[in-house]
Amino acid sequence: MGNSPSYNPPAGISPSDWLNLLQSAQRLNPRPSPSDFTDLKNYIHWFHKTQKKPWTFTSGGPTSCPPGRFGRVPLVLATLNEVLSNEGGAPGASAPEEQPPPYDPPAILPIISEGNRNRHRAWALRELQDIKKEIENKAPGSQVWIQTLRLAILQADPTPADLEQLCQYIASPVDQTAHMTSLTAAIAAAEAATPSRVLTPKTGTLTQQSAQPNAGDLRSQYQNLWLQAGKISLLVLQLQPWSTIVQGPAESSVEFVNRLQISLADNLPDGVLRNPLLTPLVMQMLTESVSKFCRGEASGRGGAKTAGLRTIGPPRMKQPALLVHTPGPKMPGPRQPAPKRPPPGPCYRCLKEGHWARDCPTKATGPPPGPCPICKDPSHWKRDCPTLKSKN
């Protein structure tokens, strides 16, 4: 994450205030170095130790930092106050400095443009992992959650493609769909309100123009819209009735999908498409066995996945394996032998019909059917041939 220190705040400052100070430090010119962040941390320790109270917007102004002791920290504080005063988010001068906790929630520092300086760099996988690790323990949509993403965006100046990659990495499919819906609506409203001298329709949409190397204010505007859409979509999903609809243990997938469709049709606001949101919701709220089956059909389209759920019955309950043979009821009397299959032709021993050769009555006694194959004598069997016995 560049030269930024840990997002965890030191003692004596709230997480929101610390993230705002880090964002303000990123606006220094020339860019901040590790020593600037060390000075900022030492200033917070000094303030908390000398003032005996946490650092806040009202008590920690530029004049609270002794000149020449903490490097460029006064510039960081001045930039923070200037940005918040322009946005109207800082507390008024009449606010008491000794305000007991809980403190009023501070304003979120917006993303501002730094001219045409090319600061963009694509996020590496390690950086995406760091961002996800920083926000996974924070409440989605909270100020600290938003500010952490703001700081990451301010450091890398991401393009729309980079932000889409980040959304896919940190959000679930349901959150991604809801975020894209909110972002599309926000971009349409911004394009209608932006003057033509700033956003030229002939050059492309806001998304296309903000991807250019020297987009400047347009890219900052897109980044703010992306964050705003993320916060709105998370709040909408958390408060909607369909967020609690899950498939019952004995409920068929068809009934579950129908219940979800009815809830979406009744509760989605006007202008929000239902179909893009239906498939990820179904995949997330299905039972584990059915969800695994659907993930196995990953090669199909989203509509085919949802339609394929109609072929899946209710989840199967685990049962003991059936025996290979189940004995039937005992019949009175001796057990009857199985009927024998009739022979296909006459016996090859006695040339008579009606029995198999193995059951031939002449097998043990009687003349052989033909001459001995060894000595050609027709009066004895091969086993009784004297020639065979003399050889043995």
Curated annotation (Swiss-Prot):
Compositionally skewed regions (Basic and acidic residues) per UniProt: 377-386
Composition bias, Pro residues: 329-346
GO (cellular component) term, any one: viral nucleocapsid
Taxonomic superkingdom: Viruses
InterPro entries for this protein: D_retro_matrix, Primate_lentivir_Gag_pol-like, Retrov_capsid_C, Retrov_capsid_N, Retrovr_matrix, Znf_CCHC, Znf_CCHC_sf
Gene Ontology BP terms: viral budding via host ESCRT complex; viral translational frameshifting
Lipid attachment in record (N-myristoyl glycine): 2
Protein name per Swiss-Prot or TrEMBL: Gag polyprotein
Organism taxonomic ancestry: Viruses, Riboviria, Pararnavirae, Artverviricota, Revtraviricetes
